[in-house]
């Protein structure tokens, strides 16, 4: 998995070295994380995320291109109750990097507006994954998934999206990342991370 992440990062550096179109992106993600314990029915745990990063699009031939990027992501989820400013439950927070390597095809609809279809893998590397418990407003124990070696830092998803670009300056992307790899290291738990994303970008 480390080799895959290194190859993806190398693809980003390659696109920087050539005459590539550069984007600055910020976005929001709605996580739909599939969790299954043993033979029990899987459940979906939702989360929220914000992202920021840069990407470069290299035109291959005609309307085809390859876009590679590097993004920072902060993801959080709260499960519990809160009353009289006292909360009981658990707060999970994830920080990480992702490298999308997406093939795209452009459909020019007007002189100043283009639609693109994007498809390809997205590689994730986790920096921090912690869950903090609270009882009656008091902070309890903290579980660090990486220190406890419960989860893999590396993850791969299949990404697809539709982008709109106008005036050669602005763009938006509506995308979906389908989690492929099981990031939980135990044999009794299945955990895959998927996310619906909305991104705004500025074109340099």
Over which residues does each language-model region extend?
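Hydrophobic, lipid-facing positions within transmembrane beta-strands of outer-membrane proteins
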Residues: 48-54, 97-101, 115, 119, ...
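Outer-membrane beta-barrel "beta-signal"
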Residues: 23, 192-204
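Sec/Tat signal peptide C-region and signal peptidase I cleavage site
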Residues: 15-20
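Extracellular/periplasm-exposed beta-strand and loop segments of Gram-negative cell-envelope proteins
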Residues: 32-46, 75-96, 126-159, 182-195
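Transmembrane beta-strands of outer-membrane beta-barrel pores
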Residues: 28-34, 72-76, 98, 107, ...
């Amino acid at each position: 998995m480390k080799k895959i992440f290194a190859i993806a990062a190398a693809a980003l550096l390659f696109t920087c070295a050539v005459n590539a179109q550069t984007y600055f992106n910020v976005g929001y993600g709605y996580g739909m994380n599939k969790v299954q314990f043993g033979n029990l029915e899987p459940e979906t745990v939702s989360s929220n995320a914000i992202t920021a990063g840069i990407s470069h699009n290299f035109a291959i031939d005609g309307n085809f291109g390859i876009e590679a990027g590097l993004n920072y992501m902060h993801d959080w989820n709260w499960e519990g109750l809160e009353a009289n400013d006292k909360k009981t439950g658990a707060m999970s927070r994830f920080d990480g990097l992702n490298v999308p390597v997406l093939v795209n095809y452009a459909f020019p609809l007007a002189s100043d507006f283009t639609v693109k279809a994007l498809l390809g893998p997205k590689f994730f590397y986790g920096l921090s994954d912690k869950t903090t418990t609270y009882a009656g407003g008091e902070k309890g124990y903290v579980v660090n998934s990486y220190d406890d070696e419960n989860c893999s830092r590396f993850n791969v998803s299949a990404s697809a999206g539709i982008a709109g670009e106008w005036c050669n300056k602005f763009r938006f992307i509506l995308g979906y990342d389908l989690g492929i790899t099981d990031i939980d290291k135990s044999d009794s738990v299945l955990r895959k991370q998927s996310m619906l994303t909305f991104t705004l970008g500025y074109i340099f």
